[in-house]
């Protein structure tokens, strides 16, 4: 399966020649072509997984906001999605800030912030490192 790019104004398309097209900017296309074959395989595996398991997209709003925050900083609070410049700042934020006790992904309620953080890490694999 090879990717081809088809020019369409300011947008480019990635295609597997089987009818699935993804709109990307020229910058995104350049970055895609710089990826290793393993990274490209991972992207295809993620897309296939989401196509075969669309229920995973039920958490898409939260996951999109999480990824957007991660683009700013690798240190993001999993409960409020606030980005921080360091791991220390994030841990201080979690320790001293009162957070919601509701899971931002599945909306399950908890009695403490710690139990909500524990749940988000164990059930949704979004952990504070």
Swiss-Prot record:
Q: What is the lineage of its organism?
A: Viruses, Viruses incertae sedis, Fuselloviridae, Alphafusellovirus
What name appears for this protein in its UniProt entry? Uncharacterized protein B-129
Residue spans making up a coiled coil are: none
Point out which parts of the chain are C2H2-type zinc fingers, as ranges: 75-99, 101-124
Which GO terms label this protein's molecular function in UniProt?
Answer: zinc ion binding
Function comment: Essential for virus function.
Q: Which UniProt keywords apply?
A: Metal-binding, Repeat, Zinc, Zinc-finger
- Per its UniProt record, what InterPro entries does this chain match? B129_C2H2-Znf, ZN622/Rei1/Reh1_Znf-C2H2, Znf_C2H2_sf, Znf_C2H2_type
